[in-house]
């Protein structure tokens, strides 16, 4: 039986009464948010709206994005990445558990020097994929061309954000490459590994 979203006490500054809010709303008020599922349009829009709102509210205080995600839709993930680059506050990314596929792309998009992985976190990069099994030939060709463009864009971002040569990133993206937290740090995807 699911327990639902826990409620926690919260008191607004200057108010005497405590109210009970769900834990995510409480954490949002502290500028902490979570990507703990597959990336899709819905979660992408929620994270984007949170980043923009909190950026408008106070543009000098960092935002913190905790990631434990198997990846998901490429375009939705790229929208999160682009928003992270657009908002004025630095977005610190913290990998806890897994940042795979487009989630690792979001992880590498955190502010340089402020990308962290927990000691037992795993990171996986690979090339974007699609399912062609029911496409007509013309659609197949157009989709393959779009995938190549997306791969070039993703590769370019990894090169820029990690400092690795393009041939290293391209070679790694040929297959699923899983990394420990320290390997991700050596690869330039994160800057720090949290101390145990």
UniProtKB/Swiss-Prot annotation:
UniProt cross-references to Gene3D superfamilies, sorted A to Z: 2-enoyl-CoA Hydratase, Chain A, domain 1
Class in the EC hierarchy, top level: hydrolase
Role summary: Cleaves peptides in various proteins in a process that requires ATP hydrolysis. Has a chymotrypsin-like activity. Plays a major role in the degradation of misfolded proteins.
Keyword tRNA processing: no
Keywords assigned: Chloroplast, Hydrolase, Plastid, Protease, Serine protease
Listed Pfam families: CLP_protease
Reactions catalysed according to its record: Hydrolysis of proteins to small peptides in the presence of ATP and magnesium. alpha-casein is the usual test substrate. In the absence of ATP, only oligopeptides shorter than five residues are hydrolyzed (such as succinyl-Leu-Tyr-|-NHMec, and Leu-Tyr-Leu-|-Tyr-Trp, in which cleavage of the -Tyr-|-Leu- and -Tyr-|-Trp bonds also occurs)
Subunit composition and interactions: Component of the chloroplastic Clp protease core complex.
Keyword Ribosomal protein in record: no
Catalytic center residues: 101 (nucleophile), 126
Record-stated family: Belongs to the peptidase S14 family.
Location(s) in or outside the cell: Plastid, Chloroplast stroma
Protein name: ATP-dependent Clp protease proteolytic subunit
This protein's GO CC annotations: chloroplast stroma; endopeptidase Clp complex
InterPro entries found in the cross-reference section: ClpP, ClpP/crotonase-like_dom_sf, ClpP/TepA, ClpP_His_AS
GO biological process: protein quality control for misfolded or incompletely synthesized proteins
Organism: Barbarea verna (Land cress)
GO molecular function (one): serine-type endopeptidase activity
Enzyme Commission no: 3.4.21.92
């Amino acid at each position: 039986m699911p327990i639902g979203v826990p409620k926690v006490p919260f008191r607004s500054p200057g108010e005497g009464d405590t109210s009970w809010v769900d834990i995510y709303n409480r954490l949002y008020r502290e500028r902490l948010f979570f990507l703990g599922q597959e990336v899709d349009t819905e979660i992408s829009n929620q994270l984007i709206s949170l980043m923009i709102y909190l950026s408008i509210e106070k543009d000098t205080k960092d935002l913190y994005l905790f990631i434990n995600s198997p990846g998901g839709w490429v375009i939705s993930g790229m929208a999160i990445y682009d928003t992270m680059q657009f908002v004025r506050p630095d977005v610190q990314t913290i990998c806890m558990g897994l940042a795979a596929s487009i989630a690792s792309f979001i992880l590498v998009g955190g502010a340089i020097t402020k990308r962290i992985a927990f000691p037992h976190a795993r990171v996986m990069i690979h090339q974007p994929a699609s399912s062609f099994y029911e496409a007509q030939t013309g659609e197949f060709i157009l989709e393959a061309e779009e995938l190549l463009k997306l791969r070039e864009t993703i590769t370019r971002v990894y090169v820029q954000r990690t400092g690795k040569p393009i041939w290293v990133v391209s070679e790694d993206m040929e297959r699923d490459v899983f990394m420990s937290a320290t390997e991700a740090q050596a690869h330039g995807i994160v800057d720090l590994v949290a101390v145990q």
